[in-house]
């Protein structure tokens, strides 16, 4: 019963709004001050239009006095005083005066007027928990038994004649404090009674967030969304992110008014889009792509491949690449040598120049800023796995000044955005963060921090973000400095999770001590490891569509890519410590090998753990499918790469493997890299003489499948072998 009582007011109010919101109340006028049309002002207008409020903006085009909005409220009083001159005698006209940059409407005119009249005063000011700007005035405030005690000048409502009296005595400067002016009037008992002023102590009309963040929560009900004040169990009509609470207003503004609900999802995501349909390649917006390689990064070759796969003509793209790492110098130069001419232009800042991270990012943004033909700046860090080729188009079509696609780390909640900031400006988890990351809430979100990948309009870089040093701010890291500077300019940063764009790489355990370091990334970055090293037709094999049986109980299917084969061979040759191919072998228990080969064991290159992960993830599922009823944990004592050469060890004598089953992966190509070779199963008199590169043979080991390695007659043959479940 208690729950029903709590929910009833919201349902009743929403029902009342839906009946009368089609036309705004004729005796209500909303006045606000906006010297320029910021994104905050456009949000305010959109929420007002949603409820059909009549809005009149005062002061557009005027300069705002004061610094950082700490002063300058006097301009608002002057403009209001002038605007009221033509309304001073309209006794029935109700005027709502409110800030706009950091305000959203949560309900419509009918509810607003009803609550105003219920206040039984001619003028109602918003109320705050904190006194400002003169704390010495606290003792003069009337004592309040229930509710907020102090006046807030960010919003008030009253009859036009009373508001005219309120501002009649204003003769201050534009840079003076409006808050102090209204406070002194309110604290004068005679004027307070004469004008008939009261405060909205219980936040029935106005919700100032400063000092009240813990009181306000989102309330979803009946396909609607409101802000509920838990302290007073009220549903405010206007939400004001005053003082340091603008980011919380951005969070609430993602939902209010009815912009996102559980029933409808995002109701405004398709508003104001910039369609690219039907536009020829030559007419598409010009984009500068900034690529940043700031630390050793795995799968850089995949990064460049994905960049090339973007569904956007290269001739409309310019490249700016900052490579801080000598380790990646050859890869970057190879990419540019092969594909640089495909782009409109290329600028490379390499490790030899020693440009710091923040300075390089400033360079990239400024290249677009200085070029009037640059419509967008697309910044992408090398640890971004951009798997959606349409990402750039999708971001452009969303038509935001600054927007980032959601990227997360595999299997983790780590992402490229923050939903909230702590008091000291660092990460804090918003209520909706997990739902956004995991896709339970889908939309376009106003957030305080983005990183790794984002799109900025060139027009924004030449206007609101024209400051050339975007990536320095106090002692913050470049990513945080960038976001702090954007927030300081009242530019919104948006994040979209409307599509699956890709993911972030984990760089925490990346090694650079090997020839091909990506081979060791199967734990940290399994998706990228699979893309680079597992054969594209492996999933078909797992579905039973590409599995052959050339000999009884010998299965043959694709497992490795060409790259996997080549890099494993090159890694072994780089290590170079091949065994001698005799029976004495100190690498194995007992020191004696019955059937010796010239090989290198996986544990010699510290690859044993990674190889076991490969067996568990990709071989074990095939084993269980091909040998029904057998389950394996893919344990092994021996896993190695064998080298066959005519003048070294051309073949292998008949033998049984010390395994329950064996895999034998061909690492190079017969007829190209070598001639001869293959495997013969003696009991079945069955031979496989043309192994396919990247395909593995899987067969039982001991007891049934007695086999030999056929002679390699020319070149060098490599195979990777594992004796599984010995």
Curated annotation (Swiss-Prot):
CDD domains: GT_LH1
Cofactor list: Fe(2+); L-ascorbate
Residues with glycosylation annotation: 196, 537, 685
EC number assigned by the record: 1.14.11.4
Protein name: Procollagen-lysine,2-oxoglutarate 5-dioxygenase 1
Subunit structure: Homodimer. Identified in a complex with P3H3 and P3H4.
Biological processes, Gene Ontology terms: collagen fibril organization; peptidyl-lysine hydroxylation
Ligand binding (Fe cation): 655, 657, 707
Pfam families named among the record's database cross-references: 2OG-FeII_Oxy, GT_PLOD, OGFOD2-like
InterPro entries according to UniProt: Collagen_mod_GT25, IPNS-like_FE2OG_OXY, Nucleotide-diphossugar_trans, Oxoglu/Fe-dep_dioxygenase_dom, Pro_4_hyd_alph, Procol_lys_dOase
SMART domains in the cross-refs: P4Hc
Membrane-topology descriptor: Peripheral membrane protein
Alphabetical keyword list: Dioxygenase, Endoplasmic reticulum, Glycoprotein, Iron, Membrane, Metal-binding, Oxidoreductase, Signal, Vitamin C
Residues at the catalytic site: 717
Signal sequence coordinates: 1-18
PANTHER family xrefs: PROCOLLAGEN-LYSINE,2-OXOGLUTARATE 5-DIOXYGENASE 1 (PTHR10730:SF5), PROCOLLAGEN-LYSINE,2-OXOGLUTARATE 5-DIOXYGENASE/GLYCOSYLTRANSFERASE 25 FAMILY MEMBER (PTHR10730)
Subcellular location: Rough endoplasmic reticulum membrane
General function of this protein: Part of a complex composed of PLOD1, P3H3 and P3H4 that catalyzes hydroxylation of lysine residues in collagen alpha chains and is required for normal assembly and cross-linkling of collagen fibrils. Forms hydroxylysine residues in -Xaa-Lys-Gly- sequences in collagens. These hydroxylysines serve as sites of attachment for carbohydrate units and are essential for the stability of the intermolecular collagen cross-links.
First-listed, main subcellular location of the protein, grouped into a coarse class: endoplasmic reticulum
Keyword Signal on entry: yes
């Amino acid at each position: 019963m208690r729950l029903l009582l709590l929910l009833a007011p919201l349902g009743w109010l929403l029902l009342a709004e839906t009946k009368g919101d089609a036309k705004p109340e004729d005796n209500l006028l909303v006045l606000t001050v906006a010297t320029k049309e910021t994104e905050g002002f456009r949000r305010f207008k959109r929420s007002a239009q949603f409820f059909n409020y009549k809005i009149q903006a005062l002061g557009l085009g005027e300069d705002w006095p004061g610094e950082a909005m700490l002063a300058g409220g006097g301009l608002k009083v002057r403009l209001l005083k002038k605007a009221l001159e033509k309304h001073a005698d309209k006794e029935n006209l109700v005027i709502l005066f409110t800030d706009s940059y950091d305000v959203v409407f949560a309900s419509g005119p009918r509810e607003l007027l009803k609550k105003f009249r219920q206040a039984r005063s001619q003028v109602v000011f918003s109320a705050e928990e904190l006194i400002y700007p003169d704390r010495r005035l606290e003792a003069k405030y009337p004592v309040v038994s229930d509710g907020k005690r102090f006046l807030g000048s960010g919003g008030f409502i009253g009859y036009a004649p009373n508001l005219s009296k309120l501002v009649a005595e204003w003769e201050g400067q534009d840079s003076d404090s409006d808050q102090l002016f209204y406070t002194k009037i309110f604290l004068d008992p005679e004027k307070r009674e004469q004008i008939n002023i009261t405060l909205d102590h219980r936040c029935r009309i106005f919700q100032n967030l400063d000092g009240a963040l813990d009181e306000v929560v989102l309330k979803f009900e009946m396909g609607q969304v409101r802000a509920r004040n838990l302290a007073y169990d009220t549903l405010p009509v206007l939400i004001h992110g005053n003082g340091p609470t603008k980011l919380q207003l951005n969070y609430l503004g993602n939902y209010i008014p009815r912009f996102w609900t559980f029933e409808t999802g995002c109701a405004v995501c398709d508003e104001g889009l910039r369609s690219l349909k039907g536009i020829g390649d030559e007419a598409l917006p010009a984009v500068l792509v900034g690529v940043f390689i700031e630390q050793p990064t795995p799968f850089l070759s995949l990064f460049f491949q994905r960049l090339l796969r973007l569904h956007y003509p290269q001739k409309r793209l310019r490249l700016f690449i900052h490579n801080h790492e000598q380790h990646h110098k050859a890869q970057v130069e190879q990419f540019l040598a092969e594909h640089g001419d495909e782009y409109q232009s290329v600028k490379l800042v390499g490790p030899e120049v020693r440009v710091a991270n923040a300075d390089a990012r400033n360079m990239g943004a400024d290249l677009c800023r200085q070029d009037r033909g640059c419509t967008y700046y697309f910044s992408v860090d090398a640890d971004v796995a951009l798997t959606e080729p349409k990402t750039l188009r999708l971001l452009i079509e969303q038509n935001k000044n600054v927007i980032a696609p959601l990227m997360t780390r595999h299997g983790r909640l780590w992402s490229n955005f923050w939903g909230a900031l702590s008091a000291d400006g660092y990460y804090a988890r918003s209520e909706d963060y997990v739902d956004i990351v995991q896709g339970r809430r889908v939309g376009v979100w106003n957030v305080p921090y983005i990183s790794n990948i984002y799109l900025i309009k060139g027009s924004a870089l030449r206007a609101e973000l024209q400051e050339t040093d975007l990536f320095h701010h106090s002692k913050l890291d470049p990513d945080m400095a960038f976001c702090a500077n954007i927030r300081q300019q009242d530019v919104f940063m948006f994040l979209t999770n409307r599509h699956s764009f890709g993911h972030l790489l984990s760089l925490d355990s990346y090694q650079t001590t090997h020839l091909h370091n990506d081979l060791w990334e199967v734990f940290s970055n399994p998706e990228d490891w699979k893309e680079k090293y597992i054969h594209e037709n492996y999933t078909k094999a797992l579905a039973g569509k590409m599995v052959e049986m050339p000999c009884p109980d010998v299965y043959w299917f694709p497992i490795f890519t060409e790259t996997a084969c080549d890099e494993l061979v090159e890694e072994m040759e780089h290590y170079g410590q091949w065994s001698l191919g005799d029976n004495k072998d100190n690498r194995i228990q007992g020191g004696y090998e019955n059937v010796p080969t010239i090989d290198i064991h996986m544990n010699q290159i510290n690859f044993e753990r990674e190889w076991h992960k490969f067996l568990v993830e990709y071989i074990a599922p095939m084993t269980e499918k091909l040998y029904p009823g057998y389950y394996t944990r893919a344990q092994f004592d021996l896993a190695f790469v064998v080298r066959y050469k005519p003048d070294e060890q051309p073949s292998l004598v008949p033998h049984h493997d010390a395994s329950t089953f064996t895999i034998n992966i061909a690492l190079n190509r017969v007829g190209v890299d070598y001639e001869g070779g293959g495997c013969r199963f003696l009991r079945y008199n069955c031979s496989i003489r043309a192994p396919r590169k990247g395909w593995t043979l899987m067969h039982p080991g001991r007891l049934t499948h007695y086999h030999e390695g056929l002679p390699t007659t020319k070149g060098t043959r490599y195979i990777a072998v594992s004796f599984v479940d010995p």
